[in-house]
Each structure stands twice: as C-alpha cells, then as structure tokens.
Amino acid sequence: MKEQATTKNVKKAAATKKTTVSKKAAESSKATATKKSTATKKTTASPKKAAAPKTAGQKTVVAKDKNDLMKLIKAAIKKNGTNCDLNFIDVSKVTDMSNLFHRSQFNGDISKWDVSNVKDMSFMFAVSQFNGNISQWNVSKVEDMGCMFQASRFDGDISQWNVSKAKDMTSMFAGTHFNGDVSRWNVSNVDDMSSMFSFSQFNGDVSQWNVSNVKNMSKMFCQSKFNRDLSQWNVSNVKDMSGMFAVSQFNGNISRWNVSNVGDMSFMFRKSQFNGDISKWKVSKDIDMSRMFEESPLADNPPKWYKE
C-alpha cells in the first residue's frame, strides 16, 4: 500500500511540475508573441517625413548698373566657375552691356536675363567662349550691336530677335563660326554693316533684308564663305563698298544694284570669285576704284566704266 501511495505521490508531483513548466512556457510564448507584435507595429508604423533637400540657388540680386553687374558676375565666376548660372542677377535696370564678357571664358546660363532696357551690346561677347542659349532675349531697344560676337565661339539661335532699333552692326559676326538663321531680321534702321560677316563661316539667307538705310558696307563679306542671293538689295544709300567682297566666294547676281551714291569701291572684288555682269552700273565720277578687280576673274575684262 505504501508503495502505491508513493507511486501516486510521484505521479502527482510530476504532473504538478509538468503543469508549472507548461504555464511558464505559455507565458514565455505569450511574451515572445507580444514582443514580436510590438516589433511588427514599430516596423509597420508610418515613417517620419523626410526633410526636403535644401537648394543651392541664390536669392535674386538686383544689378543697379553696368559696373555693379560686372562686380556680381566676377564674384559669381570666382565662386562657382565659368559655367555658372547667373540668372539670379536681375539685370532689368542695366542699359549698357558693352564689353560685359569681352575676352571671357564664361559659358554659363544667362538665358533668363531681362535685357529689355539695354541699348548698347557692343563687344558684349567679343573674343569669348560663350555659346549659350539667349534665343528668348528681348533686344528690342538695343541700338549698338557692333562687334557683339566678334571672334567668339557663338553659334546659337537668335532667329527671333527683334533688332528693329539697331543702328550699328559693325563686325557683329566677324571671325565667327556663326551660320544661324537671321533671314527675318528687321535691319531697316541699321546704317553701318561694315565687316559684319568678314572672316566668317556665314552663308545664310539675307535676301529679304531691308538695307535701304545702310551707308557703310565696307568689307562686309570680306574673306567669308558667303555666296547667297543679294539681287533684291536696295543699296542706294551706301557710300562705302571698299573691300566688300574681297577674297570671298561670292558670285551672285548684283547687276541691278543702284550704286550711284557709292564713293569708294577700292578693293571691292580683289582676289574674289566674282565674275558677274555689272556692266550697267552707274557710278559717280569721283569714285575710288583702286585695285577693285585685282587678281579676280574680272581683272582682264573689267566693265567699261572702270577706271584704275
């Protein structure tokens, strides 16, 4: 009997121990589940909103005049390099931009500049590396564009420019690779086009240009590749055509030109390809014709009115 009681007590103790272990296991499992649930909640919780990245752009700075503008440009290039964005400068008060980037390495962004009050852009990009986008510029008040792109790398789109107020286009594209579309330009107020395309790659259409107010066409296409139609040009007010087509490839029809007011035709076709008919030109008595056809196809058979 004692043995049976002992056996029952052992089984009872074992059962109690098993129950205790099971409870602990259950509690442990519950705790683990709670931890996992908490971890899951933390994981699935909405992340905190990331802060927007700060921009490196500068606040708009107003340039009071040309000198102020030049200082701002110099400081910006020194800080950010020659390809920097200068659109943060408000240039709407500036009226003179002559020589602004003359001999400069600058080739950054000035596409959004408001140049609507500028009157002088002479030498602005002369001998510079600039070839940026200025297609949307409002140049309607600019009067002087002399040497604006002379010997520069510029070859951008300026086909939509309103140049109706321009008077001086001397050497504007001289020595450049520019060959863009300027066919629709209103050049009716220009009086000086001397050397405008000299030493250039230009061979665009300018057949419809109104050049009736131009007085100086000296060296206009000298040493250029130009050979397009100029037959309809009204050159009745031109006084100087010296060297106009010298050393050029021009050989178009200019037989009906009214050159009665021209006083200087010296070197006009010297070393050029020109071999057209200009026999009906009416030239003034006191005109300078020195070396007009020298080393050209017409040298041996010049017009009858020609006098060395």
Regions found by a protein language model. Give the residues of each.
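Negatively charged
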Residues: 2-13, 17-30, 35-36, 40-308
